[in-house]
Every structure is written in C-alpha cells, then in structure tokens.
C-alpha cells in the first residue's frame, strides 16, 4: 500500500525512527557506529526509538547505556542445583527493553506490515492480544514506532504488567480469566476486527513471530553453545514452553544446525493440551492456552513435557528470597554471581529449565550433553506473586528452601511427558482445526499445507528474513533519519 507506506515514512521522519534489520539482530557488529554512540546515553526501558536496536540477545547486562557483547547473556544451571549431569544453559530475556524477549516477536509481526504500508501508522491502531508479555512488547514497539496501540490480556495476570501497560499502551483491555483463557482474548479481537482501523497482530498465528525467533533466537542460542562447548560436547536438546510457540522455531534452526538434537515443547500439567487434549487454569504466566498455536511446527517437535505449576511457583520463592538465597550459598555452594543470575528466571523461565531437567532424565544425558532454553522474562515482573506465596504458605525459611529444592527440582521424574511418534504429532497438529478453522476462519487447505508442505510453509517463512531486511533498508534510506543521525 503506497499511501500507507508514505504515511509511515513521514511519521518515521517526524519521530526519528530507524528500523533495525534481522541481520543486525543476529550480529550487532552490523549496527552503525553512530547508533551505538547514541545508545550510550539511553536507558534500556526508555521510550526512545533507538531502543529498537536493543531488540537483541547480545545486549550488555546494563540498565543504562549498554552496548553489545559477543555472547548473549545466559545462566548455566549447575548440576548441584539441577540434579542432572548435563549442562543446562538458559538465555536471558531480562536484558531486552521491557525486560522480556517478546519485543522481538512483536517486532517480527509489526515491521513487515509497516515497511510495506499494509499498516498505516496515521490510520490504524495496532492491537496486541496476549497473555501478558507480548502485548507489553507490542505496546512498547508501537510507542517507539509512533503507532497507536491496544493491549488485550487476561484480568488475572500480575499486577506489575497492568501498572506498566497503563503508562505505555494507548488502551488496555482486560478480558475474563487467567493464563489459559485465550478463547476470551480471541473473542475480543474478533469484536475489534469489525472496525477497519483496528489491525490485529495475533502472535499465535502471525508468521513474523517464528520468522524472528528462527533467525534471531535460534542463532543466538547457537552462539551461546559455540562459546561454551568443551571438546566432545554436543548440543543434545532444546526445550521451550509454548505460549504462542514462537520460540519453538528457534528449535527448528537448532535441529538443522545440530542433527540429532531433540526438541521438546513444554506446557502446564494443569492444562495439558498437547499431552492429552487437556484443559484447565494454571499459574505459569505466559504459556499454555488450551489450544495449539497456528505457528507451532508440530511435525518437527520430538517431545511434549508437562510441568506442575506448583514447582515453578515454589522455585520462584527459592531463587528470590533472602532465606532461599542463603540456602543456595551455604548448602549448595553457589557463588554470589550465579545467585544473582537466578533472579533472571521468571515463572515460565523456571518452567523451561524444569523441562530441560525432565528431558535430561528421560534421555539419560551425560556431562557431554548440553541442553538449551530461554528465559522469557525475569522475576522483576512477579514480586507480587512472591508476596502472595508468603501469605499463602507463611514466612520462608532455610529448611523450607531445602524442601522446595528437593521436592520441586531434584525430585522431578519422567512422568507427564511423551516422546512423540508421527501419529502423536499428527494428533496434536489436528487440534489446530478446532481453533483456527472452526473459530478463526482459516482454510483446511492451509492447515494441511503446514503438515504436508514444509518447504512451502515453514522453510519459506524462515527464509523471508533477507527479503524483509531489503525492505527495511529501503525504508530507512527513504526516511533519511540514519543519514542525518
């Protein structure tokens, strides 16, 4: 749409917006030096268009003025904590703007429509349906790109999310229910869709989400492995809990690079949709929504793993209270740096690590194996949840910390998980029909293509990064903002 594109170019000029490329997100060495020079004066969460260049796993771990490092920020979970001999590395989302990697997925959805003019920043409102972090990322990116935004999320999400959104999003809509009530969010977006000025960026179906994670998160996890591997070690597995399933496409990249790597998808035991078509409410914020996302490449998924939400809640308290940290130091001998890094694990990040432990036990992985995952956000977004746990279970103590570690981490078993045969994968894929064809109006032929035509669907999406980068470079050249910086 040439008119929309022209409006976006003018808006970008007015607001000094430069859009980063996927290549720059993969490799920050490609970011122009004059952008880096300006970033030294910008805070990580500042509403400044330059922070688009911090949609990057390689950010320095600084709240203000940080640049980039060759290896992304990660936490390695020692065997004394995990109870398994293999190495578990978790890449941290805390050092993205908003403290969460969802700014990346939302960028992947918004940028293509912005640089083609399908989204007109002077007319459209960007609608971000989410169970929490994606709408935060979308609202933040919208603000940086000078677009109006509408955030939609369940009413029972953490207090911190709503407080932050009230300052950033143009409009915040709370839908009934908790984490797993995505149907209610979809109903609200369906209603908003009737207004042509509302453009929906649905992370559960937008192919920009897997495009970004495949090309950015997948490459970054590979960078971490290549930096830390010792002679004889192999990248044996990767696990990601599924909210929108965007991160699962990082696993697609890893499976191509490391043949033999097993890819696991995680969900809440209280809502085991993948495992046994189950449903229910749960407390692992950001995942598990009683449906199979359109963008989940189920055919390439090797294992389904269910995590008890009680495990992730109890460990949140272990890692984020003085009593818990004293236990980690005195009893396990963890150093202060690692204890600090364990606060980089939000609730779904903890669940991701637990998936890795269960996978390691199932496949009997050894010290020659490395399993990777990501930490969507950090404990910053869940301080109110820790207070609630104290109210529910009483004051914390070192003995309670020891018990939590024993029961909720060391005590994990290989129950509630399934190594997926072809027919299991097909069953899970078929569940997409009920959400996406019956309720959301997609075509059966498109659903079948996701299963039978890998080359024309998943591979084609993954390969679109170059085309998107060409459009972004053209957009930046036309605005002239980078030249004038």
Regions inferred by a protein language model and the residue ranges of each:
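PLP-dependent amino-acid enzyme catalytic core
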Residues: 1-485
